[in-house]
């Protein structure tokens, strides 16, 4: 089994790249954002965790994500502590996901994790792919999601720089051009690794 980790800033196109891996090469994708959403919606221990740190963000047992988002943008020491605990839960989910698909003899796993490098989610990766685009397109994608320019800049400020991500990456994919160009870059990566030695997951 080969494990790819995607690293890139918000709006860089990581989910797009992950979807192409899934479609073209039948890769399974660990979507950390989706996992977090499920935890907030259904996991009582996580809901309790949110209530412990931010009681104003839980109403009748339901996490108010808009309220919680404001705590994220405040980025206090309390948030950092909460985030560290939450990340340990997500990391355990990721490990279980990888072990399950290893038993299923899955060929390719893609980790779509926003803070792959920053939170040490990359240790099981055989290859790290740096996903990047130009800043204008990156900002347009984020604004389309409903975030403000100020929120976009706040997120960028806490993420690794492009240069730091490159230091960890084996490959780079640029998503600012056409879909066909992105597909070509992915196919080139797959051709490259197919001529290397076999890799084992952790």
From Swiss-Prot:
Q: Name one Pfam family in it.
A: CoaE
Catalyzed reactions per annotation:
3'-dephospho-CoA + ATP = ADP + CoA + H(+)
User: Which UniProt keywords are present, listed alphabetically?
Assistant: ATP-binding, Coenzyme A biosynthesis, Cytoplasm, Kinase, Nucleotide-binding, Transferase
Primary enzyme class: transferase
Pathway in which this enzyme or protein is active: Cofactor biosynthesis; coenzyme A biosynthesis; CoA from (R)-pantothenate: step 5/5
Q: What function does this protein fulfil?
A: Catalyzes the phosphorylation of the 3'-hydroxyl group of dephosphocoenzyme A to form coenzyme A.
What is this protein's name? Dephospho-CoA kinase
Q: Which organism is it from?
A: Ehrlichia chaffeensis (strain ATCC CRL-10679 / Arkansas)
Per the record, the gene is: coaE
